[in-house]
């Protein structure tokens, strides 16, 4: 159970960071940090 939760959170953070990089390179401007 604990391993599954940890793996799910790790995958979520990884995909989120990938999405941030993609959006950042897109030059959309709506999401700027």
UniProtKB/Swiss-Prot annotation:
Keywords in alphabetical order: Electron transport, Membrane, Photosynthesis, Thylakoid, Transmembrane, Transmembrane helix, Transport
Family from the record: Belongs to the PetN family.
Protein's job: Component of the cytochrome b6-f complex, which mediates electron transfer between photosystem II (PSII) and photosystem I (PSI), cyclic electron flow around PSI, and state transitions.
Location (main, coarse): membrane
Transmembrane region(s): 2-22
Protein name: Cytochrome b6-f complex subunit 8
GO CC annotation: cytochrome b6f complex; plasma membrane-derived thylakoid membrane
Domain of life: Bacteria
Membrane topology classification: Single-pass membrane protein
GO molecular function terms listed in the Swiss-Prot or TrEMBL record: electron transporter, transferring electrons within cytochrome b6/f complex of photosystem II activity
InterPro entries (alphabetical): Cytochr_b6-f_cplx_su8_sf, Cytochrome_b6-f_cplx_su8
Subcellular location: Cellular thylakoid membrane
